[in-house]
């Protein structure tokens, strides 16, 4: 029995001890977990004490999951807050009489027990404007949107239309200024009946339900049906009475249905005015409610609420304007007061409906707000604002379809007429689509016209036509190929001055050099001369015309004419085809790429040809040509081949034209045993061949050494092609047949056909590597992305820009060859002499450097002191430098 005995331990001063401990903790700011702010000052407190002393704080703190929330109290002074804190922690506070009323009012708003338990109404509840973050902006991750809504519902007066939503609070009611402003709005609408307060209370209750359940897009189906189905003014009074009896019982109609049904209400002017005001109010409160639901800082909520209150006053004016638009018939219904009440109710409902629409939709509606309402006589049509909003349209299609089942056929007809903004709206949109598609097709057609399948025909055709031949003839005086101009040019060039010349000028000067300094060659006056359309230069038939295949050809090939222009010129001049050779060439290449135009002159026949086209001697069969020119042609034509093939081509030319060899030997005897151009070119070929054998010592890849950089560049004649006139390339019955016919007195049209067919064959057969007879490694294997030739190693497949680099690779690198160049000062070995030179200059600066192997690429020495050399500038042009002593030097 003794074991069952229990003792009661009582702490007599338990409550006083706890209260004193709380006070001590507050003074030391120990274990504080919330902050109250007023007038820019802060007081830290404990959540437990605040919840125990105030049901308002208890409800608010239950929804806050932040570790240390901050509550900003508006309309509460710091002295009043400090007094209430002392009252809650100590149970008593001393205050003066003049501050008593303000303290009691603040305590009533915060529902402090002992100060507001027995009081009801009159006070204004200040709201915390920011809850859930610290002073420095620290936010809580667990603070969700739903919790924010609940917290703001508990604050009371958070929304501008909120009524008495504090039913769960103990002993407190929170009437707000917003309610008084809404009442003032109803009085301005001349609705002095008792239904206003009930309508507003029903709207506020409905909004609280919408916010708690999250169904932001729901409104009353009964209200909207009554608003849209009334064909006369009397329907407004019926809708008003029905709404009062059944306030907001259904929440299944979406925003789009509301818009569609408001559109159909065009018969009653009073209903139209009310709908206009409702839609305008919806614009304002969409932004307000969106900002309210997104904001965490309650200060922003307060600011938005005040903005909404001011906006309500602005809406009052809009409602008055809507009534004025209705005209004198706006109150012709059976019950004008009820109609006005219906207008107010419609505005509240649509305002609640639009309060949860997203911000982008709100902005879109504001842009078209001014154009949304139109009135003709006694009718008013309201266009739905979100008709073309993709988000709202996709969201509400299903609900709209369900609600249209309740609409009559008349309503559907009325809705169909205005939902798309009138008849012209959809038709205009379809027309715009059609025009747009046509524009796209037109642009594609224009692009196709500008596009040309041939890469060389993309530039504008600048070849001169028949009418421009006179201008070309006038340019004869400016040509450097005339004798007087050439003499003046030689005189003007001093010994120390150097000039960059074009390919045509260089080729002409080269042949002139051969012609004047070698055996005398008889030259007869030719009946035909050829004029370049790009530079206006006169090309003598015996002149060696060169083309820079990779440079000038790519720049000037696009300046030629197309096939249609060729046919027009040929028909206009009534030309005749030059024998079977021209016919065979035309059939071989039916689509001409390069054409020319001719025009008859009173003095001499002139043929305009592009400089990019190779021209042969039109009198080659009559006038013997010096073998030097033939060898030069072979040299420059076969620049893409190795030099053994060039020598072989020279021998073939000598065998095919024995009379030229005899003639040249006779010329040598007449010249007194002078060295012929054949000797000069043979010497040139031998020097080139010897230099190829020593390419590992003379040539380096560009970039290794500045001293030996020029040795790695490609040779000048590699970029020059000359057409073989003896038929070695095209056959005896093709090119030579044409020019033989021209030499026997052919007309201008025959020259046109001959040159056209000859160019067709030239550009068909002289592709890169196409004229190579044996797969030589010195011929390009393809074309790179930049249009330059690519030399590919036949052993390992590596590709190089320069053929000299390819030869160096095959000799010193390909196949894992060991370095062959030994440094004389250290064990370093290099595969290239240029790298060895760089090594010596870098690591052995104080020791004797390696001797330079750099020399000119092409040199021509004469016994009488005449010498010359040619170089290239890597851009499709040759450079020949002269001095006053008649000597050619490499620049």
UniProtKB/Swiss-Prot annotation:
Domain annotation BTB: ranges: 32-97
Low complexity compositional bias, start-end: 162-175, 228-251, 263-293, 329-340
PROSITE patterns reported in the protein's UniProt record: BTB, ZINC_FINGER_C2H2_2
Entries under InterPro entries matching the protein: BTB/POZ_dom, Dros_DevTransReg, SKP1/BTB/POZ_sf, Znf_C2H2_sf, Znf_C2H2_type
Feature: compositional bias, Basic and acidic residues: 449-462
Function: Putative transcription factor required for axon growth and guidance in the central and peripheral nervous systems. Repels CNS axons away from the midline by promoting the expression of the midline repellent sli and its receptor robo.
Name the record gives this protein: Longitudinals lacking protein, isoform G
Gene: lola
């Amino acid at each position: 029995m003794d074991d069952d005995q229990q003792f009661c331990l009582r702490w007599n001063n338990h409550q006083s001890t706890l209260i004193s401990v709380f006070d001590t903790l507050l003074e030391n700011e120990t274990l504080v977990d919330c902050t109250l702010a007023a007038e820019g000052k802060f007081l830290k407190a404990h959540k437990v004490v605040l919840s125990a002393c105030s049901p308002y704080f208890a409800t608010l703190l239950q929804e806050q999951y932040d570790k240390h929330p901050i509550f900003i109290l508006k309309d509460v002074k710091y002295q009043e807050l400090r007094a209430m804190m002392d009252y809650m922690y100590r149970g008593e506070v001393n205050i003066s009489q003049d501050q008593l009323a303000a303290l009691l009012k603040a305590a009533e708003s915060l529902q402090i027990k002992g100060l507001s338990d027995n009081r009801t109404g009159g006070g204004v509840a200040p709201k915390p404007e920011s809850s859930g973050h610290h002073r420095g902006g620290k936010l809580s991750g667990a603070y969700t949107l739903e919790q924010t809504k609940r917290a703001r519902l508990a604050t009371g007066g958070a929304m501008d239309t909120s009524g008495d939503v504090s039913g769960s609070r103990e002993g407190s009611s929170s009437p707000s200024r917003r309610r008084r402003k809404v009442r003032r709005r109803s009085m301005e609408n001349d609705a002095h009946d008792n239904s206003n307060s009930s309508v507003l209370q029903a709207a506020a209750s409905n909004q609280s339900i919408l916010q708690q359940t999250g169904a932001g897009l729901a409104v009353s189906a009964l209200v909207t049906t009554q608003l849209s189905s009334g064909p006369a003014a009397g329907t407004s009074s019926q809708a008003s009475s029905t709404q009062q009896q059944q306030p907001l019982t259904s929440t299944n109609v979406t925003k789009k249905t509301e818009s569609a049904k408001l559109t159909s209400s065009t018969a009653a002017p009073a209903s139209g005015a009310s709908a206009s005001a409702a839609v305008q109010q919806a614009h304002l409160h969409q932004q307000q409610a969106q900002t309210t639901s997104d904001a965490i800082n309650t200060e922003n909520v307060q600011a938005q609420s005040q903005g909404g209150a001011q906006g309500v006053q602005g809406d009052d004016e809009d409602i008055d304007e809507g009534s004025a638009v209705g005209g004198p018939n706006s109150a012709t219904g059976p019950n004008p007061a009820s109609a006005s009440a219906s207008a107010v109710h419609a505005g509240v409902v649509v305002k609640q409906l639009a309060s949860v629409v997203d911000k982008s939709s709100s902005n879109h509606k504001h842009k078209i707000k001014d154009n949304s309402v139109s009135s003709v006589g006694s009718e008013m049509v309201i266009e739905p604002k979100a008709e073309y909003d993709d988000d709202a349209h996709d969201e509400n299609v299903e609900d709209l379809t369900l609600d249209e089942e309740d609409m009559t056929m008349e309503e559907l007809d009325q809705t169909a007429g205005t939902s798309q903004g009138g008849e012209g709206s959809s038709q205009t949109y379809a027309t715009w689509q059609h025009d747009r598609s046509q524009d796209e097709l037109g642009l594609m057609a224009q692009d196709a016209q500008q596009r040309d399948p041939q890469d060389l025909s993309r530039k504008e055709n600048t070849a001169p036509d028949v009418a421009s031949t006179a201008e070309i003839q006038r340019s004869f005086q400016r040509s450097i190929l005339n004798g007087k101009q050439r003499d003046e040019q030689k005189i003007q060039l001093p010994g120390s001055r150097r000039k960059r010349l074009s390919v045509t000028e260089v080729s002409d000067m080269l042949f002139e050099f051969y012609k004047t300094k070698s055996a005398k060659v008889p030259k007869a006056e030719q009946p035909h001369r050829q004029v370049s359309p790009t530079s206006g230069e006169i090309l003598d038939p015996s002149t060696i015309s060169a083309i820079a295949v990779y440079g000038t050809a790519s720049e000037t090939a696009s300046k030629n004419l197309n096939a249609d222009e060729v046919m027009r010129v040929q028909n206009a001049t009534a030309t005749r085809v030059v024998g079977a050779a021209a016919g065979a060439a035309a059939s071989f290449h039916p689509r001409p790429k390069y054409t020319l135009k001719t025009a008859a002159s009173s003095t001499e026949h002139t043929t305009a040809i592009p400089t990019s086209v190779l021209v042969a001697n039109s009198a080659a069969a009559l006038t013997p040509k010096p073998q030097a020119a033939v060898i030069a042609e072979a040299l420059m034509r076969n620049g893409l081949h190795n030099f053994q093939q060039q020598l072989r081509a020279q021998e073939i030319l000598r065998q095919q034209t024995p009379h030229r060899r005899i003639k040249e030997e006779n010329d040598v005897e007449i010249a007194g045993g002078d060295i012929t151009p054949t000797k000069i070119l043979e010497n040139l070929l031998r020097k080139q061949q010897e230099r190829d054998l020593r390419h590992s010592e003379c040539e380096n890849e560009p970039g290794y050494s500045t001293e030996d950089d020029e040795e790695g560049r490609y040779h000048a004649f590699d970029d020059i092609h000359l057409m073989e006139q003896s038929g070695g390339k095209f056959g005896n019955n093709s090119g030579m047949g044409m020019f033989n016919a021209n030499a026997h007195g052919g007309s201008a049209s025959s020259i046109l056909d001959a040159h056209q067919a000859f160019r067709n064959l030239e550009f068909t057969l002289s592709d890169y590597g196409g004229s190579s007879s044996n797969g030589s490694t010195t011929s390009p294997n393809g074309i790179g992305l930049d249009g330059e030739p690519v030399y590919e190693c036949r052993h390992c497949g590596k590709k190089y820009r320069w053929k000299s680099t390819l030869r160096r690779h095959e000799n010193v690198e390909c196949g894992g060859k060991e370095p062959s160049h030994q440094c004389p000062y250290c064990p370093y070995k290099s595969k290239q002499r240029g790298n060895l030179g760089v090594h010596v200059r870098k690591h052995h600066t104080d020791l004797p450097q390696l001797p330079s192997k750099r020399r000119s690429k092409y040199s021509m020495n004469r016994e009488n002191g005449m010498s010359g050399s040619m170089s290239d500038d890597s851009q499709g042009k040759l450079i020949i430098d002269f001095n006053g002593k008649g000597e050619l030097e490499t620049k």
